[in-house]
């Protein structure tokens, strides 16, 4: 579960500190990760803490889910790549385990909409965050009647889809009184964090430019006025999500620094606190990497024992097994770079656009600028980095 009340408490602390700097705050907007959500009752109160998408409850219901609606039909209707973590499958799993939710839940809010609600008291469903749920029709950009009816998900749980940029209301009086600050507007911005990141990219060229938003996940894609919902796109694991301006982000959700983060966490538990920059330095000292992994393999999805998983993957594919920490990190970083390259080439093939430039953004490129050397060698295109946050 996500401890949303703790997270919201930290948001209020951040607002209070920003106000204390003496700079008048005019507005606030929220973006978060996708697919997760919360249930509200008829009084507008949380029924329980929101599930985390890494919860394993969905797996046991996948077979039943896809008997009701095929992956092909779901992708054609919503443009969203079928995945166990998707909102639509999470909701289906919830209803199998807790059928009473259909009766007691009055509203479902995605995470940024939930935080906006806690800030302003206004219920909303912003487009970019809704677009990753598997519940929207890809063409109309409104809720898909066929998905709701086929899966027997109550449509009453969701309000009208709104485009980003709408002022919801001023910060609630309860919060202004609690924090002893002046009110300011709460705006429904680009609620999906990747949509927000892509909106901030200062593209340096008018030529077709791909983006890579680097973090725990890496989102590799291209902005387009039209979605791609062919069976070839489905087979390539591409997805279509919304942009702030109503266009589409044709992208692949790939593993990002998750494996690196888990290696760092495991080593810290073993008594070695190694920074990201130090990990990159260790990798740079490896002169000849001869092994690669598929960073999107299910073996790497769950936390824990990540070094052993990297070594096992190399062993199972008859490759040299990395021994030192630097070799392990080098295998992971170069494998990520080649996964990015494959995705860019798939997008080129399916859209008919030749991508000349790639713009990398996000916190994942901040660990060490030299990290992008791996991407630069693998991607064979002009590479631009920044901003990061």
Which residues are covered by each model-predicted region?
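N-terminal glycine/serine-rich phosphate-binding loop of ATP-dependent small-molecule kinases
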Residues: 1-48, 60, 64, 76, ...
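A conserved helix-loop-beta module that forms one wall/lid of the active-site cleft
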Residues: 145, 151-164
